[in-house]
Design a protein with these regions (language model features):
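Short, positively charged
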Residues: 1-2, 8-179
């Protein structure tokens, strides 16, 4: 269950007053995570056409070693192709959000680690992918866990974000599961 707090919402226009569960993410202190990086969330890539050695890549120990190792692989003719998610449950959950979600996220991860952007708006340049990734993020925020089979249901109705300045933002989806 993604619910951290339960609140009653009062809609003054409809007089609708549901009791809803919300997840809480705080920007105070460390940046909040949407999904925990674990073995369940690993993406596996296959290196094709590589003309170097494993040592050529693994000897790189710079402060930006992932980016530098990816650059070295490409310099030596290598191309990284998404192979699979390490965890089958995570893969299945991603495909429930969209049948191509593992491939979309694999592409986004590569772009991020190559230094091609830090924000989704910089890493996703296709309108359809943008919409699908937002749907995935909603699923992660409201119901999906990486290592547990997901049935498509949301276990909370929204998100409370505590901003760095202490302001609160409330995002809610009240009747989404009734569609």
């Amino acid at each position: 269950d993604k619910t951290d707090i339960t609140m009653q919402i009062h809609d003054i226009q409809t007089e609708f007053t549901p009791i809803c569960g919300f997840s809480i993410k705080s920007e105070l202190g460390n940046a909040p995570t949407l999904i925990n990086a674990t073995r369940a969330t690993n993406f596996i890539y296959e290196v094709k056409s590589f003309r170097g050695t494993l040592q050529d890549v693994n000897q790189i120990e710079t402060s930006s070693k992932i980016k530098d190792r990816l650059t070295k692989i490409e310099e030596l003719g290598g191309q990284l192709e998404f192979y699979k998610c390490e965890n089958d449950v995570f893969n299945d959950n991603l495909r429930k959000a969209d049948s191509l979600m593992p491939e979309y996220l694999a592409e986004i991860l590569l772009k991020y680690y190559k230094g091609q952007g830090r924000y989704l708006r910089d890493l996703v340049d296709d309108e359809i992918k943008t919409i699908r990734v937002k749907d995935f993020l909603k699923a992660i925020l409201l119901g999906m866990f990486s290592g547990t089979p997901w049935d498509g249901a949301y276990t909370c109705n929204g998100l409370v974000v505590v901003r760095k300045d202490g302001d609160l933002l409330l995002y809610h989806v009240i009747k989404d599961m009734e569609l």
